[in-house]
Amino acid sequence: MTLAEKALKLHEEWNGKLETVSKTPVKSREDLALAYTPGVAEPCKVIAKDKEAAYKYTMKANTVAVVSDGSAVLGLGNIGPYAAMPVMEGKAVLFKEFGGINAVPICLDTLDTEEIIKAVTYLAPGFGGINLEDISAPRCFEIEERLKATLDIPVFHDDQHGTAIVVLAGIINALKVVGKKKEDCKVVVNGAGSAGVAITKLLLTYGFPYIVMCDKVGIVSKDTEGLNWMQQKMTEVTNPKNETGSLADAMKGADIFVGVSAPGIVTEEMVASMNKDAILFAMANPVPEIMPDLARKAGARVVGTGRSDFPNQVNNVVAFPGIFKGALEGRATQITEEMKLAAANAIASLVPEDELSDNNIMPEAFMPQVADAVAEAVKSHIHN
């Protein structure tokens, strides 16, 4: 049985990966009176006077909404809200299994930015945080920014920031392996969508001075036509030498390549044109921009992908459960750049320096201390 056949069979057997489980026994009239009427009126009255009491008396304190419109799902594209539900259920499972957080999948049947913002705003009182998922660019940028500005709970688009955090964590350790400094590195980020933009922003915040973004059109510069508003904004802080040309041109003399783009678009010749001891993260899924063996053969020293069957898996699951765990426990109202940097450093630190190697730069997702380490790092930077 193939993986695809097994996955389909199991999803049919599961009939959904989630269920509601009661924490409250209802085995007697007294149980019923306490869990529901008339006893339930007492916490209602307290919360009516002070909405913050909802964190004490309801599941809000440890529950997030996983919200999608199904417009940019994995490598499947715009498949809509019904087809997106298995992914959102899966995300909720990861929240619970890796972070101990309750998560509710919500798939919205609209692509309208205003309607999505309204829907999430109306739903927000029941949740301690909002995880936006698989919403296409550039709409995702506006949706997140406006929700962050209006809601008093953390709003986090994991496709952007979770990806950026794990990429930075991997690069921090890879630089130790190859003995380079961030100030001396040229970075090429291929893919100027949600993940590529967020990765670039976080690398800039961390202190990389020389980043060139590329997209289908090649190098993204101030002269590139057809850019969306966010891509245009990124030209103001990237490509300091105003390079032009193709991806191949951008990779010449680069020290770090991060791909969040398309399968098979990086050649061995491109990798060979990079500087010695190059770091290459080919994160297109399921087929990376270049296969790891070919990248190493062409001269790359540290190679990461998004896949679990290769060394150096760069996967969001080591980030988002701990980030939300810390944000919820610390009652953060936002997830800030400081918290993202702290999370990346915490993830990187989970691989002891004496164990770092070309093929070991990322912590294993199943290490029990990952979420707690990230959560503590996030909590230490909460300044509400």
What is each model feature region?
Residues 1-153, 375, 381:
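N-terminal ligand-binding/catalytic initiation module
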Residues 12, 55-60, 96-97, 122-124, ...:
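Solvent-exposed alpha-helices and their adjacent loops that cap or buttress functional pockets
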Residues 69-71, 79, 108-109, 134-137, ...:
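Short, ordered loop/turn segments at secondary-structure junctions
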